[in-house]
Amino acid sequence: MLVIAGLGNPGKNYENTRHNVGFMVIDQLAKEWNIELNQNKFNGLYGTGFVSGKKVLLVKPLTYMNLSGECLRPLMDYYDVDNEDLTVIYDDLDLPTGKIRLRTKGSAGGHNGIKSLIQHLGTSEFDRIRIGIGRPVNGMKVVDYVLGSFTKEEAPEIEEAVDKSVKACEASLSKPFLEVMNEFNAKV
C-alpha cells in the first residue's frame, strides 16, 4: 500500500492558506482517483482505493501542522506501511511560488510538520513533494504569511503546482520515486 499524506491545518479558517497546499493536492487526488476521504481515525481524515492496480491511502492529518507525525505514525503502524511507501506533500518557503521539488530524504528545513514526522517516524528517509509558496515580503511575519491566503496573482501558479504534484503522484504508481523525482525536478 502506498500512503500519500498532504500536510495542513484542519478547519474552514485554514482552507485556502499557503500552509494547506498539501491538503489541496490530497483533495485533487481524491477527486481524480475517486477516493472518498470518509474515515476519521488516528487524528486524520483518510480514504483508500485502488489506482492503476495499486492500493493507495490518501490522508490529511487533523492534528494541526506541527503535530502531523502524531497522525501518520499510528496510521502507518495500523496498516503495516513502511516508510519507503510514504509520500508527503507540503508547502515550502524556500521555493518560489508554484515550483515543486521532489526529494527522497532530507532535513526538516525549518518545517515543523516535517520535523514532527521525522521525530515520530524515527527517520528522515521518506519521499516528499515540496510546493513552493515563496517568502513573505515587507517585514510580514512568517506565521502570518503561511496562514494567509494566496493572492489572485499566485492562485494560477498554485493551481499549476497542484496539477504537477498530482501528476508526480500518478507517475510514482508505475515508476520508482527516484525516477519520478529526476523527471519532475528537471522541469523546474
UniProtKB/Swiss-Prot annotation:
Single annotated GO MF: peptidyl-tRNA hydrolase activity
Active-site residues (renumbered): 19
InterPro entries documented for this protein: Pept_tRNA_hydro (IPR001328), Pept_tRNA_hydro_CS (IPR018171), Pept_tRNA_hydro_sf (IPR036416)
Catalytic EC class: hydrolase
Compartment list: Cytoplasm
Site label Stabilizes the basic form of H active site to accept a proton, positions: 91
Record-listed E.C. numbers: 3.1.1.29
Keyword RNA-binding appears in the UniProt entry: yes
Catalytic activity: an N-acyl-L-alpha-aminoacyl-tRNA + H2O = an N-acyl-L-amino acid + a tRNA + H(+)
Site positions (Discriminates between blocked and unblocked aminoacyl-tRNA): 9
Source domain of life: Bacteria
Primary localisation category: cytoplasm
BP-aspect Gene Ontology terms: protein quality control for misfolded or incompletely synthesized proteins; rescue of stalled ribosome
Binding site for tRNA: 14, 64, 66, 112
Pfam families, sorted: Pept_tRNA_hydro
An example Gene Ontology CC term for this record: cytoplasm
HAMAP family in the record: Pept_tRNA_hydro_bact (MF_00083)
Family label: Belongs to the PTH family.
Protein known as: Peptidyl-tRNA hydrolase
Native source organism of the sequence: Bacillus subtilis (strain 168)
Gene behind this protein: pth
